[in-house]
């Protein structure tokens, strides 16, 4: 009887081991297949005298593919979920150039984490100029991709460069005046007062010293002042970083306080009617950071805009089901307008 039990246990052991081995082999094959669909190359380019860091994704087996240029939103860095988009687009046959702004991550530039629309737009200009020099991509088929704050940047840039073939703006920042009034002054007057204090403090500190007065980028309601302090802000940002403990995020959770003023008077929507290329604008119906109707208003000002809205919050597009749905919609839009071969 003991021998039979031992035999049964051995058979079960081998069956389970075979099942695990089969699953591991399948996963290995999937990873190998994905890794052979594109390569990622470290790149460095210059903006206003500083070295900016970037990744260039190149699809395998495609000579001079079209290219998508992307950068992150407010206080974001390129490793925060942007590779998820870049990899999917590369698998669809497009090159992707993902860069960090001056002062962020491993890019040079002072002050650190300086969120400034004019400065960011200079970096976009430099990225576009650099990508045009690459002989590994077809810069005549170029798209711009932005999200949140950079969703506004790509609209401004597309209006500036008529040769751009397509633009994608995900949950974009559209109008600083409307955002400040509707989402902050009316909703939380104390936020406006505290923001004014920190903005003035930063200006004074920077005038008389070499330092900056920093504020937190993300926080929770009732905590120390943060530029993004809605109920879903901190958890939303942590989703992008993959960091579970927000204490581990605090070392990069800051930016100079004068953004309170520069953000208020930044209005990408004022340039929307100058965008000539096809545009995909994606809105979030439950957005608490920006007015939910802003993306639709911006799309209505464009000549060739497609507008999509989803019942989601500002930070939801980056993961889970919203990401899976939207990345396919974006990919199909880009493939069509960048004339990607259907053979890929």
Predicted regions and their residues:
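Alpha/beta-hydrolase-fold enzymes
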Residues: 156-243
């Amino acid at each position: 009887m003991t021998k039979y039990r031992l035999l049964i246990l051995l058979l079960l052991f081998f069956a389970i081991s075979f099942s695990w081995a089969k699953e591991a082999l399948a996963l290995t094959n999937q990873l190998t297949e994905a890794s052979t669909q594109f390569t990622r190359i470290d790149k460095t380019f210059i903006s206003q005298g500083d070295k900016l860091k970037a990744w260039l994704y190149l699809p395998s087996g495609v000579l001079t593919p079209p290219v998508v240029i992307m950068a992150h939103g407010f206080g974001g860095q390129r490793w925060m979920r942007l590779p998820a988009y870049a990899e999917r687009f590369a698998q669809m046959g497009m090159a992707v150039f993902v860069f960090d702004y001056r002062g962020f991550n491993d890019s040079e530039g002072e002050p650190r984490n300086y969120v400034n629309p004019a400065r960011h737009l200079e970096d976009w200009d430099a990225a576009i100029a650099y990508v045009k020099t690459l002989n590994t991509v077809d810069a005549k088929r170029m798209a711009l991709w932005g999200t949140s704050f950079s969703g506004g940047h790509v609209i401004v840039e597309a209006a500036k460069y008529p040769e751009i073939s397509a633009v994608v703006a995900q949950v974009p920042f559209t109008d600083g005046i409307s955002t400040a009034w509707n989402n902050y002054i009316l909703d939380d007057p104390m936020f406006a007062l505290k923001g004014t204090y920190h903005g003035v403090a930063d200006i004074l500190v920077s005038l008389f010293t070499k330092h900056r007065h920093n504020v937190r980028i993300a926080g929770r309601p009732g905590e120390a002042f943060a530029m993004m302090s809605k109920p879903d802000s901190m958890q939303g940002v942590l989703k992008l970083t993959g960091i579970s403990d927000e204490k581990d995020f605090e070392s990069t959770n800051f930016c100079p306080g004068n953004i309170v003023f520069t953000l208020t008077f930044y209005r990408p929507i004022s340039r929307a009617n100058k965008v000539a290329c096809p545009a995909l604008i994606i809105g979030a119906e439950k957005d608490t950071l920006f007015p939910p109707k802003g993306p639709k208003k911006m799309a209505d000002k464009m000549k060739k805009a497609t507008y999509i809205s989803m019942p989601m919050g500002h930070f939801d597009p980056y993961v889970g089901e919203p990401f899976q749905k939207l990345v396919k919609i974006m990919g199909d839009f880009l493939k069509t307008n960048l004339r990607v071969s259907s053979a890929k």
